[in-house]
């Protein structure tokens, strides 16, 4: 994991972070409990002016990122400044999240857009592990 400061990051219990996370924590980054962070995810809080003169002054500014509980960020996801991702969301691999994602959403793409809402009834038998039988 690579961080800017390391002081502005809170990670909830049971969260798994894979290889290559970049967390630019100029502002607060909050990651909920029981999240799964895929490889090479970027959490980017810094913001920069578009206008040349203010940008040349190198003033540091940032907007916080909030990730709810039980969120899965697929590999290579980029979360932009000021974004909140609600609880129980799945963000598809390679997505660029530029706006808030409501609780229980499946979002994909660049920019990420919500495809549908998720709940326990969404998942059929192929998503459940069968009970293990003990050999006789």
Give the residues covered by each predicted segment.
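Short glycine-rich donor-binding/catalytic loop of glycosyltransferases
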Residues: 94-95, 100-102, 111-112, 118-119
């Amino acid at each position: 994991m690579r961080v800017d400061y390391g002081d502005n990051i809170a990670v909830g219990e049971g969260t798994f972070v894979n290889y290559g996370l970049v967390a630019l924590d100029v502002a607060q980054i909050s990651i909920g409990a029981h999240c799964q962070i895929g490889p090479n995810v970027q959490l980017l809080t810094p913001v920069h002016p578009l206008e040349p003169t203010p940008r040349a002054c190198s003033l540091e500014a940032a907007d916080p990122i909030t990730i709810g509980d039980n969120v899965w960020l697929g590999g290579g996801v980029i979360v932009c400044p000021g974004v909140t991702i609600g609880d129980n969301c799945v963000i598809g691999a390679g997505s660029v999240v530029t706006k808030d994602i409501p609780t229980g959403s499946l979002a994909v793409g660049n920019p990420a857009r919500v495809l549908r809402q998720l709940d326990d009834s969404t998942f059929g038998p192929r998503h459940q592990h069968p009970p293990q039988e003990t050999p006789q």
